[in-house]
Amino acid sequence: MARVLVVCAEPIGPQVAGPAIRARELARVLADSHEVTIAAPAPSVTGDVRIALVEAGFEDYDALSAALAGADVVVAQSLPPRLLSKLPALGTRLIADLYNPTVFEVLEAGRDKATAARRRQQRTVTLASIAQLAAASHVICASEQQRDLWLGMMAAEGLVGIEDYSRDPTLRSVIDVVPFGLPSEPPVATSPAPIRAMFPSIAADDRIVLWGGGVWNWLDPETAIDAIGLIEQGRTSGPRTHLVMMGMGRPASEELDAMRAGQRMLGHLTRSGLEGEVVHVNRGWVDYDERGGWLLEADLGVSTHHDHLESRLAFRTRMLDYIWAALPIVATTGDTLSALIERDGLGLTVAPGDAAGLAQAISALLDDPARLASAKLSLERLAPKMTWQQSAASLSAICSNEIATGSPDRAALRRATLAQYPPLLAETHATHGLRGAAARALRNLRRTLTPGS
């Protein structure tokens, strides 16, 4: 039994999104075989009596440092540079969870920023990813496409060890796939049904298409809105088809809130005249344990994105929820999960930006009960194969040291860590002025010079 620390950069509580969901669910699986602690910013709860909690964010250097020192293994999607560089000396093994293709996500997330700020952010995120790869004994990601991305970065940075390759030419022992999983228990319907309780203008026999998550720069809600508008425009009788946006007020999301995607979507919706008629937006965020009621009340799940690299490499949490609830899916082509929809008959896919095609696909499913039932049956068969227990089975063995893993590259870690400071200080200077940048530099210098820090 290993002492495993799971680090999350976001609070873990009733309202969570992808990164916090993954941290909590991986911790739950690992707690079956290990002594597990979660470190996350306050306020957080583990929701599991087997899991200890350290309320510490990345700015809580001393508390997080002590938690790292007390662990045999740390599983983290990211760590601050100073703490990452301490791991080899502590003897704590890092499993870097790179399920999020940050090196491309940052290009979309910062699309509305000035070019200089985007370059600084891109440089920082890229160096942070290199540092994670250099520090890790093992790397996990969510798909084979992501694995190819990180293997390419490792090769370019000289992080493919000859000894590791000689022992395992597949390098699965160094970097492998741990997909985002599903709960083992199916969702439970709630009473009253939450969607119609919030939006009472939706009639009992109307059809609901659910947008099951937030609105970010890399997504394309406008095409979904336009598709619903086309369906309404062509309706002569019978039930209406409504688009329901499940949430916009994502917790712990200062960076995401700064994106203009939500503003653009609301502006587009206002111009369309569809809000309150056939498009409905929850400005809040649905609790993680209550989302099942929303999923079960819907007739279809939709996920649309733009055609870019982030979309090709992403592993959409909302799509996993649709599979969990056996909710037939209409989605944009181009990523891992859209290929799964096509292969297993889970719904239909359309080209990016094709509102007319999306409208046709939605109607093709909703107007054909047999086709809809077939998709639901395929989803019901697939869901038990994608649980967290199955997706993370290898992770427990890695934490137990039952599988030989790679070795951290201390020299590469040192280079990547030091290289992060200039863009980080430049970003601090841009946002907090010279005094803020100087204070950050002094803190880092003090920690460097303090023994054991």
Short names for language-model regions:
Residues L171, R371, R381-S453:
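C-terminal amphipathic helix plus adjacent low-complexity
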Residues A134-P194, A204:
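Donor nucleotide-sugar binding/catalytic pocket of nucleotide-sugar-dependent glycosyltransferases
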Residues L300-S303, D321-A331:
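Short hydrophobic beta-strand element within catalytic cores of glycosyltransferases
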Residues M1-V45, I231-R240, L434, A438-S453:
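N-terminal subdomain of nucleotide-sugar transferases
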